Amino acid sequence: MGYILNDEGKDLLATVKEFCEKEVKEQCKEYDVSGEWPKEIYDKAAEMGLGALEVPEEFGGIGIDRVTAGALYEEMAKADAGFFTTMTASNLALKPVLIAGNGEQKQFACDVLLNGGYGAFCLTEPKGGSDPGDCKTTAVKDGDEYVINGRKCFI
């Protein structure tokens, strides 16, 4: 797919493409066969900030736009779907915190990704699967408190 990127975006794309070609593509195939975790690849990706692309500038991220992020993600996915998924899945955990968290929570979540960590988005409803839109639990404000109704199970 073609993207219209600014000069910074083009430079980032070239860097990610080179990294994926040299470090990810063939090596991840070998790890798929061996079943090992390619820690050194993910450590290098973390050093490059690839797991924290969506951290806003105000919390220490590079503040790239969605189009540039999409181009970088596409390049990662071309190299290896598992690598792409690992690098982007933390954003599922980050988004709700950025939307509804307080400043301290937002900074904490962003720092985890900026320091090479990972986030996880987990649903605890029976039959929850991976569709948060299908959740049945409700939270209704009752005075100063919330009344929560629903069924939960642990992952």
Which residues does each predicted region cover?
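Glycine-rich flavin
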Residues: 23-155
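A non-catalytic, amphipathic alpha-helix used as a structural packing/dimerization or gating element
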Residues: 8-22
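Intrinsic disorder at enzyme termini
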Residues: 1-11, 139
